[in-house]
Amino acid sequence: ENREAYLKERMLFDVSLFSTKQDSKKKPMRLMPMLRWTARIAAAIVIAVSGYYMTTDYIYNKNAQPQTITVPAGQRAQITLADGTRVWLNAQSTLTYASNFGRKERNVELDGEAYFEVTKNKKLPFYVHTEMNKVRVVGTCFNVCAYKGSKEFETTLVEGIVDIYPSCNDQVITRLQKDEFFANYDGRCKKTILPSYEYLRWKEGLYCFDDVPFSGILDKLEKYYNVKISVTSPRLLTHEGLTGKFREQDGIEHILRTISKEHPFKFSINEA
């Protein structure tokens, strides 16, 4: 209907161009309504188009439901996201993402530890959001360890490039290149070259510790084996620089016994 009205007005306007000089005095009377009508049509188109995108975005956001993957203590899991990205989740880790992940954005939220093999897509950067920091990548392989409440954030880059930001803004803290490691321990940041990828072998069920404080090892063992470890002698927690490599199937008793040979202590296991 609008188009027919527009064509009718257009025809009247064209006819007026061939009118006499006397009629030309009346042109403004014909032209002004024409301009107002054209403006209405243009406004209607703009409003209609804007309304379409607003409705589309509304439906997109409304239909997006959070998807949550939680891995219990003592277990690991591997998933593949809609864009083909593969994710390995360590014990006591949770990954959350929208049900429409990959359509207009690629955002995931991590509480715990995960290894990512991100499918490359320059138009849709991949973001990992954690309690303290967020990581931005296009397509790469990297590890993130950031358990809520620990005040610790670690990222190891295996391949590609990643940018690291605070969780609250978009000001880049640092950019990691291949084989680089970044950590934020309660506001104290450090960046180093990773000597090896051994400690990333948790994906295979191999736990590798290289110059790790005893307290840090105990914390990981609690997650890996779903146990609660109580230390009666605080002096033990001051032990630093412990190095070792253990298979998951060795069990926590074997690991503690092996460590106690280098740093003597006694332990007991109470079955619940």
Language model: regions and residue ranges:
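A short, acidic loop/turn at secondary-structure junctions
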Residues: 1-25
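A residue-level detector for the "anchor" residue at the start of short, highly conserved motifs
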Residues: 19-41, 45-272
